[in-house]
Regions:
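An alpha-helical, amphipathic repeat domain used for nucleic-acid recognition
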Residues: 1-163
Length: 163
């Protein structure tokens, strides 16, 4: 019985302590933090006070989070459409997401990354023909679309592919 009481007392952290503990593992958006704290059983008042504390001290900053997320996503070969969608799923406002993408991502970069991904997809295909078939072009286009590249960047990349 004593062990159970000690375990319960040990598990229940203050809302701020729980938030700071979770932030040790990485940056979070405001939405992610609120959801986490609700899941842990904290009430709305505690969460509101905690969020004000975290935002005031810049422990949570959706602008900073969005910029880092865009950088990492670009390195992974994701396009701006997918990046925007993923940021919005994480609770980052559309304006903040668009601003972060515009700051780090430009049209030239998108076209270059799309071409790199298309070339990688082409290397993975075992084709002996000199020209790309329509079927191969469609397969590459689907891959680029799934990665979040615009139609313009996709068509440009396919047009620039060398066989």
């Amino acid at each position: 019985m004593e062990k159970l009481v000690k375990k319960e007392a040990k598990e229940k952290r203050s809302c701020k302590d729980e938030a700071l503990f979770w932030l040790e593992y990485g940056d979070r958006t405001e939405k992610e933090m609120v959801q986490h704290l609700k899941k842990k059983g904290y009430d709305e008042r505690e969460i509101a006070e905690c969020m004000a504390f975290l935002v005031d001290l810049s422990f949570i900053d959706d602008n900073r989070y969005a910029l880092k997320f865009v950088e990492v996503s670009m390195e992974k070969g994701r396009g701006p459409i997918r990046i925007r969608h993923e940021l919005q799923e994480k609770g980052v406002a559309g304006g903040i997401a668009d601003e972060a993408i515009a700051t780090i991502y430009d049209r030239t970069t998108e076209r270059e990354l799309a071409l790199e991904l298309a070339e990688k997809a082409l290397r993975g295909m075992d084709r002996s023909e000199e020209r790309l078939s329509d079927k191969d072009k469609a397969k590459i286009a689907r891959k680029l679309a799934a990665a979040g590249f615009s139609a313009g960047a996709t068509y440009d990349a396919i047009g620039r592919l060398k066989r």
